[in-house]
Amino acid sequence: MKQQAKSRKPQQPEYIFQVETLSHEGRGIAHYGSHPDHPADKHGKKVFIRYALPGETVKAQITHEAKRLEEAEMVELLAEPSANRVEAVCPHYGICGGCSMQHIHPDEQIHLKQNVLQSHLQHFAGIQPEQWLEPIRSLQSDYRRRARIGVRYLPKQDRLILGFREHHSNRLTSIHTCSVLDKKLSDNLPELRNLLQSLKGKAHIGHVELAKGDHEISLLVRHIEKLNNADVNQLRQFALHKGWQLYLQPKDQSLRRIDEEQGAMRLHYALNAFDVNFAFSPLDFTQVNATVNEQMVQLACELLQLQQGERVLDLFCGLGNFSLPLARCVGAKGQVVGVEASEEMVQRATDNAKRNNLVQASFFSQDLTKDFSHHSWANQGFDALLIDPPRAGAYEIMQYVPNFGAKRIVYVSCNPATLARDAGVLVQHGYQLKKAAVMDMFTHTEHVESIALFEKIQEIND
């Protein structure tokens, strides 16, 4: 069986390799020396091969050479494919840089991500959870409810490109569909491209952002020069026809909704298991995968084992995605304190608590990378702690954790390396890693989302 690659760069050497294992980001790993045509001076050198899977024999073209390793791209599958190989569902896969694992069976994707988390915990902290929980799985398509899509006008060709960046490149590749984007968004991409192509100011548009709430869709157009009235009216008519909210964002980053009389500048989503509803702006951070998000919040609340009347601290709380469900769990006699750097997001969380009649939830603005020990909210004592930091993790916060007095900590992570680093500090503070799970928030990509439960097991003089 032979399988041709999607592209081939001229004047780059090609070799046959036996693929041995997968890297953390899903590339096949092979070594020089497994085939007679390999250069003798390269024997033993490691090669990372895009699209190749363990057990396969492939022809690969070298794309990058370094002293200790090389990178390559599979151009031909020379024997039987791996049992874990599947047909990619997207016609743009291999050119568009959005997905990197559509050729890998979903079960193997999750297995790989769990191995990544396990490896990082061992390497950085020397620990493993007492129990691995079942992974939280995603839909395999139509799961993304928001996307930023690049726009570039090519004047010599009078052609507008609407699409995503190519793999490891700043070049945009034109797309007419996206298999992981919500179908109500993906199906409108060709019509949206034609609309943007027709605008006089198309050369001044940098990107568009599509976002979907449970019942609304928004279109945000980012432009570096002011659009004329005719262009704005064309965008308005398109949005009215679709029933979408339309927003313009000029170079100064301000956000303006067109036709504000049509309703408030908000989208909405609900977490039905907790009877809470959230309002958010198109620029607010929200989890892109609604199905996984709801399962994640439910699992976090289950792991914390909250009782009525308990006190919970939610760090990096955003618009209250965890805070409001936590407030439901502790009841009217409990208290949830949410802390977030962005004052705008704190106001959004406060408004969301009010709209859900959750008076037991309060929110504070604080840069959590700076000393916050003098603030009153940090010295109240808590039964439980939830941390959902950005990719950089929560290392600066770890020194304050003993002062919170939390018996249980749930750490939600989008970076297994920083989770493992911070886990090592929590262990030093007398916590034990009890449970962990991976969450397939970004299926078909190498991004690893995870959740971990730590419990206090001993008192340590910090």
Curated annotation (Swiss-Prot):
It catalyses: uridine(1939) in 23S rRNA + S-adenosyl-L-methionine = 5-methyluridine(1939) in 23S rRNA + S-adenosyl-L-homocysteine + H(+). Its EC number is 2.1.1.190. The keyword Iron applies. Residues 6-76 form the TRAM domain. One of its GO terms (biological process) is rRNA base methylation. InterPro entries: 23S_rRNA_MeTrfase_RlmD (IPR001566), MeTrfase_TrmA_AS (IPR030390), NA-bd_OB-fold (IPR012340), SAM-dependent_MTases_sf (IPR029063), TRAM_dom (IPR002792), U5_MeTrfase_fam (IPR010280). S-adenosyl-L-methionine binds at residues 287, 316, 321, 340, 367, 388. The active site is at 414 (nucleophile). One of its GO terms (molecular function) is 4 iron, 4 sulfur cluster binding. Pfam families: TRAM, tRNA_U5-meth_tr. [4Fe-4S] cluster binds at residues 90, 96, 99, 178. Keywords: 4Fe-4S, Iron, Iron-sulfur, Metal-binding, Methyltransferase, rRNA processing, S-adenosyl-L-methionine, Transferase. It is an enzyme of class 2 (transferase). Coiled coil: none annotated. NCBIfam families: PRK13168.1, rumA. PANTHER family: 23S RRNA (URACIL(1939)-C(5))-METHYLTRANSFERASE RLMD, RNA M5U METHYLTRANSFERASE. HAMAP family: 23SrRNA_methyltr_RlmD. Catalyzes the formation of 5-methyl-uridine at position 1939 (m5U1939) in 23S rRNA. Belongs to the class I-like SAM-binding methyltransferase superfamily. RNA M5U methyltransferase family. RlmD subfamily. This is 23S rRNA (uracil(1939)-C(5))-methyltransferase RlmD. It comes from Acinetobacter baumannii (strain AB0057). The gene is rlmD.
